[in-house]
Regions:
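Secondary-structure end/capping motifs
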Residues: 215-298
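Short, glycine-/small- and polar/acidic-enriched structural segments
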Residues: 19-165, 169-173, 192
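Conserved C-terminal helix/tail region of periplasmic/extracytoplasmic solute-binding proteins
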Residues: 285-323
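N-terminal export leaders
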Residues: 1-4
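Sec/Tat signal peptide C-region and signal peptidase I cleavage site
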Residues: 13-18
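Short, surface-exposed acidic
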Residues: 148-153, 251-262, 302-309
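Structured segments of extracytoplasmic/periplasmic soluble domains
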Residues: 42-45, 51, 69, 73, ...
Length: 323
């Protein structure tokens, strides 16, 4: 009887413990991949539970409007992008960016090996294949900093086939995605990571609603803390996070994940810049001022916007999560 009682008590304790966790829905910006690894790692290794959270991760994709899902209350947190966040707040969305997992944007221009600089692309007037979103993010920056012109633009359809067929094509790409496909096809492309040339945007940010911040600031703080600990853990041993990534996105291969991790580390996207000394996820007023300045210069945002309405530094880890 004692044994049966113990078993019964044991089976009861799990749901009771689960009931004490705050349920949270976090939406990513694309299908599961290495660039989301820290969040999946925090879930896989129990870091979210350690901070009293029961987190469901929902994938983004081409048809998913993350901002809409966040503002409508279907998600508590959303993976965002600094430039998009500024626009959202300007349009009256009640959202705030509370952390940045990536100190630099993984967006790059990719060219064939004989192209050695961003200046050369302009000098030779090469066609640059970009997606529509580039017009309100990095393209205006390339125009103001490098003199690129709109007549260089060609529409990018997220296929590297045109690039592989023509040595004079330049295209946008994600550091760990298109170059991987090109290398598989036997080309070692020139990759110009825009962040390395001064493009100021934070990426893979955590956005939440002003309502949640008001209602439960402690929950926001715990989600940020656990997520950034997840990133530190992911770079030490990514296996737990990778298992969840592949479960969510069965088309993702081990090789592609390994390439993604290698590129994040090589370019210090998560652990470089301010994060190296001030902890993963860190944001600064100075950096947001640069983002604001670029957007003002490019005519992407109205002068009436107060940049401090876009972000808050109050929910960053109190104990920095050093890489």
């Amino acid at each position: 009887l004692g044994m049966a009682g113990a078993v019964l008590a044991g089976s009861l304790s799990s749901p009771l413990m689960a009931a004490e966790l705050d349920e949270v829905v976090f939406g990513t910006n694309w299908y599961a991949q290495a660039e989301h690894g820290g969040f999946y790692q925090a879930k896989a290794t129990g870091l979210y539970e350690k901070y009293g959270l029961d987190v469901s991760i929902e994938m983004g994709g081409p048809q998913v409007n993350g901002m809409q899902l966040l503002v409508s209350g279907k998600r508590d947190f959303s993976m965002g992008y600094a430039v998009g966040a500024v626009k959202a707040v300007e349009q009256g969305m009640p959202v705030t960016t509370v952390a940045a997992a990536f100190q630099g944007d993984p967006q790059a221009l990719i060219a064939h090996p004989h192209i050695t600089s961003l200046e050369q692309i302009k000098a030779e007037g090469l066609p640059v294949y970009i997606a529509a979103f580039a017009n309100t993010t990095f393209w205006p920056w390339l125009k103001s900093k490098y003199g690129y012109t709109d007549d260089m633009i060609r529409p990018y359809t997220f296929s590297v086939a045109p690039f592989l067929a023509d040595k004079d094509i330049v295209q946008q790409g994600y550091l760990s995605s298109e170059p991987f496909a090109m290398e598989k096809a036997g080309i070692q492309p020139s990759v110009f990571l825009l962040a390395d040339y001064g493009y100021p945007a934070y990426a893979t940010t955590i956005e939440t609603t002003d309502g949640l911040i008001e209602e439960n600031p402690d929950l926001v703080r715990r989600f940020v803390q656990a997520s950034m600990e997840g990133w530190a853990s992911y770079f030490k041993d990514p296996a737990p996070g990778n298992a969840l990534i592949k479960e969510a996105n069965p088309e993702m291969t081990d090789e592609q994940i390994a390439y993604g991790i290698a590129k994040m580390q090589e370019y210090g996207l998560v652990t470089g810049g301010d994060a190296a000394t001030r902890g993963i996820g860190v944001m600064t007023d100075a950096r947001w001022a640069k983002i604001h300045e670029f957007m003002l210069e490019a005519g992407l945002v109205d002068a009436s916007l107060d940049i401090h309405d876009v972000y808050s530094l109050d929910y960053l880890p109190t104990e920095p999560v050093l890489p």
